[in-house]
């Protein structure tokens, strides 16, 4: 029966994109294979549930995972110190690394990595640090610091798998707060592509998501989000949806991909003004809107 259950479950999860699935036959009532190996299941050679939970690598570290750091706080106690505080979402950073601040695109070099226990030469995912830079760059809370040459996706329109958690349905067109890491913006569901039957994983047509529904939703937000797909980076691929009136979290989302955006057609005045600003005020860091 155990082998039949394994086979049935593997078939069910084929479409769920799981990298690693483990099975443990156990009895919660009798404690079999929960903490100690069960004498009643000599045919099972694997680990107990507790041993598996203590040894499994939930999020394996990868030396090549891109560095992502969302600024949570700008620390400026005096004119001689300006640091950007936050928790490293993924990857690692070294003193001397060249970074890019988003959305401005300005570059600098990491001068110091400051922690409560002293300065470091290197910091890794999950560590709370303050970064100081060689150059004075205007970076605010919610903006992102990444390494040069390894940029995230940037968009105002994206598709996400959404878990809806409120009694009031998710309605396309209704404005919500979208919290992506430390960045808060506003946005709305443009359309609901489908929702899932959680028992069969069948995609069903739907114009709304009710409480406990899971669905594929296209979003439009008012400010550019810098992200990696959730399957590649949970730290920058997740967001929460907050009701603007009650401030209650009503949903959670996992970004799958950016949507194709229509090329913005700028007027002659906008093009000329952009050229003038970049020519005469380069220190403003204005981007070339023709690219």
Language-model regions, residue ranges each:
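C-terminal effector modules of nucleic-acid-centric enzymes and ribosome-associated factors
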Residues: 1, 11, 137-291
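Conserved catalytic-core segments of large NTP-driven translation/proteostasis enzymes
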Residues: 3, 10-168
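Generic detector of well-ordered alpha-helical segments enriched in charged/polar residues
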Residues: 6, 50-54, 270, 274, ...
């Amino acid at each position: 029966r155990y082998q039949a259950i394994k086979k049935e479950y593997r078939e069910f999860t084929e479409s769920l994109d799981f990298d690693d699935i483990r099975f443990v036959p156990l009895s919660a009532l009798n404690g079999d294979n929960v903490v100690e190996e069960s004498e009643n299941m000599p045919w099972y050679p694997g680990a107990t549930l507790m041993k598996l939970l203590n040894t499994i690598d939930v999020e394996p570290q990868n030396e090549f995972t891109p560095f992502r750091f969302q600024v949570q706080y700008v620390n400026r106690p005096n004119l001689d110190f300006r640091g950007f505080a936050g928790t490293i979402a993924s990857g690692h950073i070294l003193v001397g690394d060249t970074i890019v601040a988003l959305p401005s695109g300005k570059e600098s070099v990491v001068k110091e990595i400051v922690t409560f226990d002293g300065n470091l030469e290197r910091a890794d995912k999950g560590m709370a640090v303050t970064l100081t830079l060689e150059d004075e760059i205007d970076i605010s809370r919610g903006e992102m610091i990444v390494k040069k040459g390894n940029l995230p996706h940037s968009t105002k329109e994206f598709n996400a798998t959404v878990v809806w958690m409120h009694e009031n349905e998710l309605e396309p067109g209704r404005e919500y707060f979208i919290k992506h890491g430390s960045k808060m913006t506003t946005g709305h569901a443009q359309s609901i592509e489908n929702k899932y039957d959680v028992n069969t994983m069948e995609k069903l047509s739907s114009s709304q998501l009710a409480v406990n529904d899971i669905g594929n939703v296209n979003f439009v937000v008012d400010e550019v989000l810098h992200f990696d797909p959730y399957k590649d980076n949970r730290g920058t691929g997740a967001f929460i949806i907050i009701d603007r009136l009650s401030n209650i979290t009503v949903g959670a989302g996992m970004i799958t991909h950016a949507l194709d955006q229509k090329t913005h057609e700028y007027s002659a005045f906008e093009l000329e003004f952009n050229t003038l600003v970049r020519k005469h005020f380069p220190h403003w860091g204005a981007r070339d809107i023709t690219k």
